[in-house]
Amino acid sequence: MTVDLFAGISVSDIASGRQWYERFFGAEPAFLPNNAEAVWEVGEHRYVYIEARPTHAGHSQCTLFVDDLDGWVDPIVRRGIEPDERETYDNGVRHVTFRDPDGNEVSFGAAPDGA
């Protein structure tokens, strides 16, 4: 049985949100289901979407746990978006958090090398 996972992020304005997330992901959306949403495929059967929901904007959190943290984070930084926070936990897990213009958190995490 196949399951597709969609992680949603509420933004105040779809046009400005789409512009920021296109820069963040380095690509246009995979598809636009309607005038209020934009969807990016971040892995097989895994999607992050933004939705114009102004009263909810700024309260979303989304974490992508990846096998190559630098491979995801470094290109975002090269596109001009700096992380809000970088952490390494006692167990070696690394965590990098970005904030979109509405204040939503989009993070990447990775297991310690060799784990």
Language model: regions and residue ranges:
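Short amphipathic alpha-helices within nucleic acid-binding modules
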Residues: 70-75
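Conserved short beta-strand elements that form part of the metal-binding/catalytic scaffold
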Residues: 27-60, 105-111
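Short hydrophobic/aromatic beta-strand element in the GNAT-like acyltransferase core
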Residues: 8, 39, 47, 63, ...
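Short glycine-enriched loop/turn motifs at secondary-structure junctions
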Residues: 1-3, 54-59, 89-90
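Conserved active-site tyrosine of GNAT-family acetyltransferases
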Residues: 17-22, 76, 103
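N-terminal beta-strand motif that seeds the catalytic metal site of vicinal oxygen chelate
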Residues: 1-18, 60-62, 112-115
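Conserved acetyl-CoA-binding loop of GNAT-fold acetyltransferases
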Residues: 24-30, 80-82
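Vicinal oxygen chelate
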Residues: 78-115
